[in-house]
Amino acid sequence: MASSDLEAATALKVQGNKAFGQHEWPTAVDFYTQAIAKYDREPSFFSNRAQAHIKLEAYGFAIADATKALELDPAYTKAYWRRALANTAILNYKDALRDFKVVAKREPNNRDAKVKLADCEKLVRRMEFEKAIEVGDPPSAFEDLDIDAIAVDDSYDGVRLEKEMTQEFIDDMIERFKNGKKIHRKYAFQIVKAVKDIVYAEPTMVEIGVDQGTKLTVCGDTHGQFFDLLEIFRLNGYPSEKHAYLFNGDFVDRGSWSTEIALLLYAYKWLRPNGIFLNRGNHETDDMNKVYGFEGECKAKYNERMFKVFSESFSALPLATLIGNKYLVLHGGLFSDDNTSLDDIRKLDRHNQRQPGQQGLMMEMLWTDPQTEPGRGPSKRGVGLQFGPDVTKRFCEKNGLEAIIRSHEVRMEGYEVEHDGRCITVFSAPKYCDTTENKGAFINVGPELKLDFQVFEAVPHPDIKPMAYAQNSIMSMM
């Protein structure tokens, strides 16, 4: 290629770097991709695009780009670093460890590399230990937990919770959380136990309508961004007898108020079981919670048992909600097999499989993503797969649906309508992780089943960083 191609490509890389510095990750990816199209022999173009993919949680793409950079220049240490980060994000700790070792060996004075290497070694040891002691059917986390015997001191300055949830308790809980206070662990245990029992009895696919004089609001990922959740309620109304909410998974992890969101949504679910609906997301799972902050947050704010009971409640959550026989709402997306139908979801016994694993219907419902190309493709995340507009069309036509509504991915405008209107993504965590300049969105659905998209901006929150409770330093790099 002519030197002019390299010069033009380098100029595009500079524009990509500028967009990256402004937290405009999709724009950065576009510029790096244009640079590669001009000149595909420069490893930094691929390595920089890998870093932008990491910010977009496209970890599979990041691994592929970092690997390409190393094919072009095996001495390009930065690519090992980025591939290690991406592998850590999708829990491929052993692959990450190999790359962290390379970085630490090549840069012996790099203190950060030594810390990340040590953290990754701990993750590998923990994974191997947990696998060694794993039992097929563990006892309930509520076994031997005598909630009634837990005493609440007279000094507790909040509203007391008796045997049933009240609006008064919820109102007080919201104010406590806003002011950096907790509720008593007894009340937290009560809430989780009550909701675990409620959702366990619900079908794997909950089927609901929207009655005259009422509305339903569908929210996407909230990821521990408690103050942005309150902004949704401020703008759109709090849950009530006439106003139901459906939260489409990923209530927890990343944001540092995950226990607050989970307890608030659970409290509303207990108060109005038919007015709050909760789908499971890929972050309502043990593997993700142990890496992305929720386990550490439970331990820091309550205790280890609190995480275990939450984990058990997460495994009981429904996987999908069908609205008016027109919209299938699920966290990730569609399936590897065109023959999969709504009846297959109905028949899925989620209670026999507490965690989604690496394959199968539950994993696909929690992890897959849409793509613009027809057919199916490998996952940009490195987990699951991607499905094209033809896949969505066939599924909707076969099952009599107007569209699927999913979450699972940042959208810069808060939502996106794709696949000829048949695939809708809604994401409700604006300024995601305090680094992405995205808006949040939610969808209001009335009795006529028309979709009304609402967009909102992030609001200020106390100075606690995302991932503050993650139990290793690696994830702070994401």
UniProtKB/Swiss-Prot annotation:
The family database entries (InterPro entries) matched by this protein are listed as: Calcineurin-like_PHP_ApaH, Metallo-depent_PP-like, PP5_C, PPP_dom, PPP_phosphatase, Ser/Thr-sp_prot-phosphatase, TPR-like_helical_dom_sf, TPR_rpt
Cellular localization per UniProt:
Nucleus
- The catalytic site is made up of 283 (proton donor/acceptor)
Enumerate the transmembrane spans. Answer: none
| Alphabetized Pfam families for the sequence | Metallophos, PPP5
Q: Which GO terms describe its cellular component?
A: nucleus
Please list the reactions this protein catalyses.
Answer: O-phospho-L-seryl-[protein] + H2O = L-seryl-[protein] + phosphate; O-phospho-L-threonyl-[protein] + H2O = L-threonyl-[protein] + phosphate
Where, in this chain's numbering, is Mn(2+) 1 bound?
Answer: 221, 223, 250
Q: Which UniProt keywords apply?
A: Hydrolase, Manganese, Metal-binding, Nucleus, Protein phosphatase, Repeat, TPR repeat
Query: What does the entry list as the binding residues for Mn(2+) 2?
Result: 250, 282, 331, 408
Q: State which Enzyme Commission number(s) the record gives.
A: 3.1.3.16
Q: Where are the TPR repeats?
A: 9-42, 43-76, 78-110
Task: Give the molecular function GO annotations.
Answer: metal ion binding; phosphatase activity; protein serine/threonine phosphatase activity
The protein's matches in CDD domains, at most eight in alphabetical order, are given as: MPP_PP5_C
Q: Where is this region: Catalytic?
A: 151-463
Say which domain of life the source belongs to: Eukaryota
Question: How is the cofactor bound, as the UniProt entry phrases it?
Answer: Binds 2 Mg(2+) or Mn(2+) cations per subunit.
Requisite cofactors = Mg(2+); Mn(2+)
The record describes the protein's role as: Protein phosphatase that specifically binds to and dephosphorylates the molecular chaperone Hsp90. Dephosphorylation positively regulates the Hsp90 chaperone machinery.
Q: What is known of its domains?
A: The TPR repeats mediate protein-protein interactions with substrate proteins, but also autoinhibit PPT phosphatase activity.
Name the family.
Belongs to the PPP phosphatase family. PP-5 (PP-T) subfamily.
Q: What is this protein called?
A: Serine/threonine-protein phosphatase T
Q: Record the organism.
A: Aspergillus oryzae (strain ATCC 42149 / RIB 40)
